[in-house]
Amino acid sequence: MLRFIAGIFFGLTTLVAADSFDVCVYGGNASGVMAACAAAKEGAKVIVVEPSRWLGGMTGGGLMHIDWGREEAVSGSTRPILKKDHKDAQYRAVFAEMLQAAGVTVLFEHRVGAVEKSAGAIRAISLDLAPFDETGCPPAAPMKAGARVIAAKVFIDCSYEGDLMARAGVAYAYGREAKSTYGESLAGAQPPMSIYAIDPYVKAGDPQSGLLPGLQSTPVAPVGEADKLTMGYGFRWRFVFKGESLPIEPPANYDPKQFELYRRAFQQGVDILSGRVMRGKVDGWEKSGGRVYSGGAGNLARALFAPTNYGHNAGYADGDYATRARIWKEQQDFVRGMTHFLRTDPSVPAKQKEIALSAGLEKGAFDDTKGYPHQLYVREARRMVSDYVVTQKDMEGKAAPADSVGIASYGVDEWPYATVPLDGKVALMGGYYSMLYLEDEHRGIYRIPYRSIVPKKDQCTNLLVPVCVSASHIAMTSIRMEPVWMILGESAGVAASLAVKAGTSVQDVPYAELYPKLRALTQKVDLPKKKETKPK
């Protein structure tokens, strides 16, 4: 029977400070689990350090519908796991069973505080004990700094944020590059994806009165130029409207003034709870720049009135733990407050109020956090900058790296970046969604090279980074799908074990030795023949 005890290890070994491992995986999301199991199966002594008290990241934290891109691109040990199409709690249990079967030790609720390096390699990491709260949010400050020290021969940073990578002194970027940086036609800031005829100012028509809550004065770069914005983060909520459910409680700091945008929308007859409205024409609702999405639930999810406060995650990607804790909690409070507003405010039409009153949180998904999802959907944060940067050229089939460790196949999938005033209206800035690459001659399938998951050798010789890979922003909008990160995690785990056995740097792992091991895992690293391809 598995033992999950916050703040300590589970497994066969009780550890003391500065215990040593062959491989330390930082981040127990799906990619981290795959990396740890792959390294352990190769004979390495492995530990996973997970900042929260749950395994699986977004795969076990609310994602549910997992985007594959081309079905045949998903391979290796990842494929049979995702083929079963589990629910959140089931994925978490599957990942725990995998780690236990592989003999991997797991440390929950510890996050990296400092990194010890010498001679270009990480020698050990100091970990702070920082338990998440009862609703699944991280703390601003740790309970105990320097609570554990873990030494390892090779480290794998599978975190969504790239925290170990950054603390190890590895070069990285965040935000959007300009078109000119890598010669990418889709790069840089984009036009508004939607413009709403709602006055953005506290006092209608008066910019001096300040912006309504929920809007930002964020500077948005000219189209095609670089900025530091990241696409919106949020939670994948498990709302139910019938039967038993867990209550959605208002936040302690609830203030109805925070939802003045909603009041003004209701005054103009905008049904903010209907996907029909977001897919159709509404008086005063405009489309701009060819960036409005069409079809599917994506319209509503990427619209102004969605369970994500677009732009509010500014500062998260390269922020400290206190900044991230604030953003994480504010995103949760936003949806809790929005629900309470819809239930109680006099401005809400009867039909919308009825829907909100019937809403609850699904039982069985996140019961130990009162039904609230425990993983913020960090779609993109830092990106390593290494000797090989995956770009739009790779996606378009204009590059053919010879050291592939996995293939990706999703289109460009961005979400809005900021909610700002524009000419007296409210604009949802940026974001682009295109499945174009699935229809191109190269079928949207492209290789991810080994060089893109290892740092430059003069920066760190014993670190692999299969999540915050070396890629441009545009390439990351495609790579960022969980199956790809799982595939790259498994490849990184195998490479780490080879580096340990040979006593060499990760950059010097012979691809001639790595390739057959990946193929033995049924990992596809070569492009499939054209007749094999089909979308999923």
Predicted regions and their residues:
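Flavin (FAD/FMN)-binding glycine-rich loop and adjacent Rossmann-like elements that form
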Residues: A124, L129-V154, C158-P535
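Beta1/beta-strand and adjacent pyrophosphate-binding region of the FAD-binding site
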Residues: D19-N29
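Bacterial N-terminal signal peptides
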Residues: R3-T14
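Solvent-exposed, acidic/flexible segments
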Residues: N29, D88, R92, R324-Q332
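Structural recognition of the beta-strand scaffold that forms the well-ordered cores
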Residues: C24-Y26, I47-E50, G57-T59, H65, ...
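N-terminal Rossmann-fold NAD(P) dinucleotide-binding loop
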Residues: G32
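Conserved N-terminal/central alpha/beta ligand/cofactor-binding core
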Residues: A38, A44-K45, V49-A121, A152, ...
